[in-house]
Regions:
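Transmembrane alpha-helices and adjacent helix-loop boundaries
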Residues: 1-274
Length: 274
């Protein structure tokens, strides 16, 4: 496999994990613009544990997932007390806080970036991505997944039915943070370098767009959105400077024609899944 093809496939796998990191809170009715914060936490935690304590990169990645999940759980309760635009602003502020803190931490390179020599190859990254896809699909066949979907459909009705809306939203937010941390850890250990400047709010917006493009109504949506955003720019590479213009026009056209996302309940994918 060529180095270029491997890099594209690795990015596809990581972006798929990222898409599900944004998807889980969105299914619970929460727009999280702080995805990049947890990606940065995962990347730097894994790199630091690997560099400073000699942890195997896979072990460091799993530890980074735990760190991101713990921090996600801690911030979920105060952040999820807000709603709508205020929730988006709160997660935006979280993103800025984490990015600013890392930029001023000399222990992890600050603004100069942080090298992570220990390497994780494509097969391991692909295995993690496959595991995430399977777990998400299985989760949405469980009581938890059905309950989260009910919250998304009608939060007030879900509350009247006795569901713990706040608990479900916190769990979805925490799970999303864990997946974002995993994506960050895999990126750090595959590309062997991380920079805090890359994890701004624009990064989070791109990830949210993966989900909005594919659709939030089924677990197939994020998978499609990540594939389109990863592969389409590469397929348009031959168009040189115009590829991003063409790409943007295609995305705008798709989202205008399918405002609920390409894949919705009742579509062919949903019927196949059932």
């Amino acid at each position: 496999m060529s180095g270029y093809l491997e890099s594209v496939l690795v990015l596809l796998a990581i972006n798929t994990i990222l898409a599900y990191a944004a998807f889980l809170p969105m299914v619970a009715g929460q727009l999280n613009l702080g995805v990049a914060a947890f990606v940065a936490i995962g990347a730097y935690s894994a790199g630091y544990l690997s560099n400073s304590f000699g942890l195997h990169p896979v072990a460091a990645a799993l530890a980074a997932v735990a760190v991101a999940a713990m921090l996600g759980w801690i911030v979920a309760f105060p952040i999820l007390r807000t709603r709508g635009i205020y929730l988006a602003l709160a997660t935006f502020a979280l993103n800025q806080l984490v990015q600013g803190t890392i930029l001023n931490l000399d222990a992890v390179g600050g603004a100069s970036g942080y090298p992570v020599p220990a390497h994780i190859g494509f097969p391991v990254v692909a295995a993690f991505a496959a595991a995430v896809i399977v777990l998400v699909f299985l989760a949405f066949r469980t009581r938890f997944g059905i309950s989260v979907t009910a919250v998304s459909d009608d939060e007030r009705a879900a509350d009247l039915m006795g569901l713990s809306v706040r608990g479900l939203q916190s769990a979805a937010f925490t799970a999303g943070a864990a997946l974002a941390g995993l994506a960050g850890a895999l990126y750090a250990h595959h590309f062997n370098y991380v920079e805090a400047q890359n994890y701004g709010v624009l990064f989070s917006i791109y990830v949210v767009l993966y989900v909005l493009l594919g659709g939030t109504q089924t677990a197939y949506g994020p998978l499609l959105g990540a594939a389109v955003f990863t592969l389409l720019p590469e397929l348009l590479r031959g168009s040189a400077a115009w590829r991003y213009v063409i790409f943007a026009c295609l995305i705008i056209a798709i989202m205008s024609l399918r405002p609920q996302g390409v894949i919705v309940r009742g579509s062919w994918f949903s019927k196949r899944a059932a």
